[in-house]
Amino acid sequence: MNHTPLIQAATQTLIDHVDELTALDQAIGDGDHGLNMRRGAQAIQAKMDVLSTQSLNEALKTMGMTCMSTIGGSSGPVFGTLLVTLAKELPAQPTSADLARALDAGIKALTRLGKAEVGQKTLLDVLDPVRQLLAAAGDLNGAELLARVRQCADDSVLATAQMEAGRGRSSFLGERALGHVDPGSRSMALIISSICDRL
């Protein structure tokens, strides 16, 4: 599998949606999520020559370390930890079951990192439903599975609007955060959808 087009698509969608992500974060956070994610995406794109020569696992680790060093706020460690964990867990040619197991490891790593849990208005609320879908995929063919994953990610983002935040700056808002989707969840869904579109 050539991962370079997937990386290009995922990073470009974050750059293209910077204004949306900024607006989402201005509503319930400190307003810098979009700019931080764009900075990380641009830093990854600047390494495309290196990433294109690396294996999937090496590229995931490189991107994870890049996120940690370039993305400000909590998003750098969060997305960096997720990518580094996936680098350790994924085989070179992952199946849907492999992806589910790797996401499970990533969710556990993020829970240890930030003490967040599913249902607390974080990107875990996108990752976990997608993990469950992949784990139960069975004999779904590629096109149908990709469509379901994309829809699951989009639906899961919308569901965060009905959650009170348990972690991060938005947790101080309590019920005032209701009605607003989580910016990190939206970023995660954008990444997932862009990858599905290119597979």
Residue ranges and their predicted role:
Residues 1-199:
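N-terminal loops that bind phosphate or other acidic moieties
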